[in-house]
Amino acid sequence: MARQKGLIKLHGTMGDITFYRSKDGYMAREKGGVSAERIKNDPRFQRTRENGAEFGRAGKAGKLLRSSIQSLLRTAADNRMVGRLTKEFVKVIQMDATNPRGLRNVIDGEAELLEGFEFNIQGKLSTSLSAPFMPTIDRATGDMIVNIDPFIPAESLIAPSGSTHYKIVTASMDINFESSAYASETNETPVQPIDTELTEPLQLSNNLNPDSTNPLFLVLGISFYQEVNGTFYEMKNGAHNALQIVKVSGTP
């Protein structure tokens, strides 16, 4: 690339030269790159094709998982979540020790690597909720449960300034990444005050198909509200709501 000189600074493309502005100033570069046809057929780009196939598979898997909890993600996801989730699915696929490179997939990979994934970096569950909890997945019965120990909300919740209430939610997903089908179920508490009263032990349970052979996922989240004249408003339109994959059971 070359730096533009002179009084007149150009933008756009002229012939094979593209003019643009970057943090380094006004620049110019010549068109280049490899054609799609060459990447598709040239043996020297075999690795590129393999990487592309697996990346596409990861993107499709991430989209399917997001679809299974779309209603929760509307208020509990940051603007880079899609890319971050795809990156994690690439890691899952790369752990497939059965299939050759380019044909590796989620089913034969390590879906458990997704445990701990935060859908909202701006409101991580790991910092929003300090109360001990235990997630369990029973594949035989289809029961997916989160048990949360008693806690004092004012002490155990890191809530956005101005929050007066909170709600805890769980979601369970049974996902077939080969057929692009899924089953999901959610459960949630009523909206509760952020006060100094010790809560009762809390259990949120969902039930999906027993003896499933698909990867199973259990998600836990929390959202924050401000009460104004009896109406609850989500804080900053849910910008600080947390949602995390807390348990994964890959294929049996």
Name the predicted role of every residue range.
Residues I93-N237:
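Charged linear interaction tracts used for macromolecular binding and regulation
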Residues K87-K91, D174-I175, V248:
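Eukaryote-specific, cytoplasm-facing alpha-helical/coiled-coil scaffolding segments in long proteins
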Residues V228-P252:
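C-terminal interaction-tip segments
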Residues M1-G123:
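Long, polar/Ser/Thr-enriched low-complexity segments
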